[in-house]
Regions:
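Conserved N-terminal phosphate-binding loop of PLP-dependent enzymes in the Aspartate aminotransferase
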Residues: 1-393
């Protein structure tokens, strides 16, 4: 059956992914299974999406109940779940207004439009962005323009003009790019695709000051590093700053496709109005029910406390690999978005781990990304470490 499923996809689906030769059928907790029942420990969580793990009964029951009521209705009408989900996100972000999207890429596009509209409303004439080298903000055209990897932009040029790239964690490089056309500075609080690079508190606070001093908006992209993964609801909350706009997606719906961008009162009252932006599916009853139930379970299960308890153990086990394995160089990141820098080819290591029943993915050119479901325990960390040692040997 496994080969049949792979052949069906190869025949029907446009090849934009280099898939591993495994078919996933179902999951439970931090584990996934193929159709024949082979078990895999998941340390990728669907690219940091499945934070509650798989087959969470309370979450599943909430979705089933909402499906029985209504999945979708037009944004021309109010529904019973959108407002609550928005309030739930306001509570954990401290933001003033929220707009629901279907993905992180759409959230980035909304943030771009919000920043541009704010500049238009304020009659500043500003339209340019400063983004970071090695950043990743998505696959849509605006998001690609902000992504600091030339290989992602080049095939689609000309992309959105007026984007300049600074060096991450280097305030002087940011200051050198600021001009009277800069409308926003955008960055990931922890770079995921770029190699698990965490912004320093000094850098984040410096960006905030640059923005305040120059009338520029600060946008934090928390699509991958947000929703508890850093040990706080959102990683910027550990930095002593508040952005003007933030983006989120992935884990906020625990696997249901939903994203959002949120903003302060100042931005909300001077940016998007009816006719400026919209979405067909965003804010639909099913996705919003998923957001609210995810947040409810996070709070009930004290998920942030759990992340802060298990993350140092993950760091310890990764450091032990560095100390004992010639191919391991350095541990990066924090919380449950960590990375192991290695000297062996990423593809070789991930393939060997897959054979041993461990799902891991790369970040950048030389980092193994550790973004497991947030529900993992020490026993799963131990299991991962043993398999990874074999894969690096």
């Amino acid at each position: 059956m496994t080969n049949q499923y792979m052949q069906e996809e190869d025949d029907a689906i446009l090849k934009t992914y280099n898939r591993y030769p495994v078919v996933l059928d179902h999951g439970d907790g931090a584990y996934l299974y193929d159709p024949e029942g082979k078990k895999y420990l998941d340390f990728s969580a669907g690219y940091a999406v499945s934070s509650l793990g798989y087959n969470n009964k309370e979450f599943n029951d909430a979705l089933k109940a909402q499906i029985d009521k209504m999945i979708h209705t037009s944004n021309l009408y109010y529904n019973t779940t959108c407002g609550k989900a928005g309030e739930d996100l306001k509570k954990i972000t401290g933001m003033y207004k929220v707009f629901f999207t279907n993905s992180g890429g759409e959230a980035i596009e909304g943030a771009i439009k919000t920043a541009r509209k704010y500049a238009y409303t304020k009659k500043t004439g500003r339209y340019e962005f400063i983004a970071m080298e090695n950043s990743f903000h998505g696959r849509s055209m605006g998001a690609v323009a902000l992504t600091g990897h030339k290989e992602y932009r080049e095939p689609f040029e000309p992309v959105m003009p007026g984007v300049h790239f600074a060096t991450y964690n280097d305030l002087d490089s940011v200051k050198a790019l600021v001009n009277d056309k800069t409308c926003a500075i955008i960055l990931e609080t922890i770079q995921g695709e770029g190699g698990i690079n965490a912004a320093t508190e000094e850098f984040m606070q410096g960006i905030r000051k640059i923005c305040d001093d120059n009338g520029i908006l600060m946008i934090c992209d928390e699509v991958q590093c947000g929703m508890g993964r850093s040990g706080a609801w959102f990683a910027w909350q550990q930095m002593g700053i508040t952005p003007d706009i933030m983006t989120m997606a992935k884990a906020i719906g625990s696997g249901v496709p939903v994203g959002a961008f949120a903003m302060t009162k100042e931005v909300a009252e001077n940016s998007l109005v009816p006719g400026d932006h919209g979405t067909t599916y965003g804010g639909n009853p099913l996705c919003c029910a998923a957001v609210s139930k995810t947040i409810e379970i996070f709070e009930k299960e004290h998920m942030l406390d759990h992340v802060n308890e298990i993350a140092p153990y993950l760091t310890q086990k990764l450091q032990e690999i560095v100390d004992t394995c010639d191919a391991a160089v350095k541990v990066k990141g924090r919380g449950l978005i960590q990375g192991l820098q290695i000297t062996k080819p990423i593809g070789e290591v991930t393939a060997k781990a897959l054979e041993e029943g461990l799902l891991i993915i790369g970040a950048g050119t030389d980092v193994i990304r550790m973004i497991p479901p947030l529900v993992i325990g020490k026993e799963q960390v131990d299991e991962m470490a043993e398999i990874l040692k074999k894969a690096l040997a």
